[in-house]
């Protein structure tokens, strides 16, 4: 129930943990740093998987699966890559009661094991492009964990593509980060900023990394997806060459891209409230709950409740009845608000007599009456669409309110405690590092979307807020998860 949840204003971090556990989304396990994703949480992941998988396949990608274990020699082939991941790796040293001749790394990401296969599969330009996605689990030995947001083991998808030219790889990188943006905004109702990472923040082993960044209700940023241009780095590490259409040998160009179950954490922190989970209808496996108010003629009310569910299902709206008598209607109202069911329908004897019902929205908690006539399903569908749009609009308005532009470092230090900060940066790793050390804020993204560039005149030259040196453009700073 909602009374188990600490309020956001009292302790935002505890609110998040309380909500995840009370809404039965996930729980701690007996394995340090690992979580149990409960059915309510996994249902959200399944909806995410289905939407993303369809988007991937629409753009020509196919699914495959590669081994969980990666030989140490493979990991060592790409020096920058292993340097970035070594501290987080879990390593298998024994198997079958014996010490292994070569250590096996439990995958932190799959570039190396996949490129070992690509080397065997690619000989000619006719073998390209390869557009493969993998749904899998990965392990990164995290020291400070938080349910969904940062765990030792998590679920994700990782795309790995191979191309004949740098330009084709660049197109793929932008195509996939655009798909992630579309998914975040259209399904998660989550406005995101799309752009490039700085050199120090890019993926280990990549030439460049593109990302989408979202704002949570505490003003912090959350990286919601990344797409990496790997250049020819992994192809060279695995000697993966192909014969071009001109008959020459060249190394293959590569990309990788991924999102994970941390998107569920983003969903929770972007939309939910002190009563519990708030879900966009497109990611709710159960969009409507019908709660009969059983007084007087119970049979007629139950029959009408079942009829409502049947009608809604025929129109593609996932609905169910809770007719159990163990708990009161009031208890059920609170419980389904906690679980984030987007729409509640209340039906009692008086409603039945008036050929109507009461509907309650989870996003605004507003109640209205709907006639039980031929327009009923259409009106429910319209309300669900309205909830989806309202959640996006509300999150966008919040982000805009919590985004400020500053001209001095003193202004910056105050502003970055509350949200996103737009400021000039001189482009040096030194300045970026010192700002992070002093404020714990990082450069989240160098925006590339025209709308965002125009809104904040991002490409306007100026003076770096920290060093006072000339700055070619503005960037987005924030504290982050």
From Swiss-Prot:
<comment type="function">
    <text>Catalyzes the attachment of proline to tRNA(Pro) in a two-step reaction: proline is first activated by ATP to form Pro-AMP and then transferred to the acceptor end of tRNA(Pro).</text>
</comment>
<dbReference type="InterPro" id="IPR033721">
    <property type="entry name" value="ProRS_core_arch_euk"/>
</dbReference>
<dbReference type="InterPro" id="IPR036621">
    <property type="entry name" value="Anticodon-bd_dom_sf"/>
</dbReference>
<dbReference type="GO" id="GO:0005524">
    <property type="term" value="F:ATP binding"/>
</dbReference>
<dbReference type="InterPro" id="IPR002316">
    <property type="entry name" value="Pro-tRNA-ligase_IIa"/>
</dbReference>
<dbReference type="GO" id="GO:0017101">
    <property type="term" value="C:aminoacyl-tRNA synthetase multienzyme complex"/>
</dbReference>
<dbReference type="GO" id="GO:0006433">
    <property type="term" value="P:prolyl-tRNA aminoacylation"/>
</dbReference>
<dbReference type="GO" id="GO:0005737">
    <property type="term" value="C:cytoplasm"/>
</dbReference>
<keyword id="KW-0067">ATP-binding</keyword>
<dbReference type="InterPro" id="IPR017449">
    <property type="entry name" value="Pro-tRNA_synth_II"/>
</dbReference>
<dbReference type="Pfam" id="PF09180">
    <property type="entry name" value="ProRS-C_1"/>
</dbReference>
<comment type="similarity">
    <text>Belongs to the class-II aminoacyl-tRNA synthetase family. ProS type 3 subfamily.</text>
</comment>
<dbReference type="GO" id="GO:0004827">
    <property type="term" value="F:proline-tRNA ligase activity"/>
</dbReference>
<dbReference type="Pfam" id="PF00587">
    <property type="entry name" value="tRNA-synt_2b"/>
</dbReference>
<dbReference type="InterPro" id="IPR004154">
    <property type="entry name" value="Anticodon-bd"/>
</dbReference>
<comment type="subunit">
    <text>Homodimer.</text>
</comment>
<dbReference type="Pfam" id="PF03129">
    <property type="entry name" value="HGTP_anticodon"/>
</dbReference>
<dbReference type="InterPro" id="IPR045864">
    <property type="entry name" value="aa-tRNA-synth_II/BPL/LPL"/>
</dbReference>
<protein>
    <recommendedName>
        <fullName>Proline--tRNA ligase</fullName>
        <ecNumber>6.1.1.15</ecNumber>
    </recommendedName>
</protein>
<keyword id="KW-0436">Ligase</keyword>
<keyword id="KW-0963">Cytoplasm</keyword>
<dbReference type="InterPro" id="IPR004499">
    <property type="entry name" value="Pro-tRNA-ligase_IIa_arc-type"/>
</dbReference>
<dbReference type="InterPro" id="IPR006195">
    <property type="entry name" value="aa-tRNA-synth_II"/>
</dbReference>
<dbReference type="InterPro" id="IPR002314">
    <property type="entry name" value="aa-tRNA-synt_IIb"/>
</dbReference>
<keyword id="KW-0648">Protein biosynthesis</keyword>
<keyword id="KW-0030">Aminoacyl-tRNA synthetase</keyword>
<keyword id="KW-0547">Nucleotide-binding</keyword>
<dbReference type="InterPro" id="IPR016061">
    <property type="entry name" value="Pro-tRNA_ligase_II_C"/>
</dbReference>
